Amino acid sequence: MYGTFPSRLLFHRLESMVATIRVLLVDDDSLVRQILSRMLASYPELDVVGQAATGEEAVSRVEELSPQVVVMDIRMPKMDGIAAAREIKQRYPQVQIIGLSEYGNGYNADAMLKAGAVAVFHKSKSPEELYPAIMKAGGDNSTASA
């Protein structure tokens, strides 16, 4: 005889079957962080574990939160995203970094990739375009630019 299967247990089992990618958002603009956080929260495979406003804060948050992927602005006051990416990759080589740029300057994108980022996205792109890049970064170490 089949008994009823509690929906809560079913939900918990399904939820535990979905692999999650831990993401840290880094941008000196709190509105950008807020928009990205809300957008990424709609994907059950992604877990935004924290945010940071500076490169220095990003480095310490990586140590504290152990994200798999860091989505980071390139231009920030004090320690920029390029220097922070170098520091993070030196200390935590397994962490994947995706750069965000609001400038059309290819130098910044190239410098970010050389610092260890696996991709660089222009901030004018739809935040939804970031999702596949985060999924890819969370799963491998290949390099891409958009």
Indicate where each model-derived feature is located.
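The feature encodes the CheY-like receiver
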Residues: 77, 105
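C-terminal output helix
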Residues: 107, 125-135
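Short hydrophobic/Thr-rich beta-strand motif most characteristic of the beta2 strand and flanking loop
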Residues: 45-53, 61
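Acidic catalytic/metal-coordinating carboxylates
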Residues: 54-57, 80-83
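As written
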Residues: 81, 112-118
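Conserved acidic segment of CheY-like receiver
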Residues: 19-32, 36-40
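Active-site beta3 strand of CheY-like receiver
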Residues: 65-71
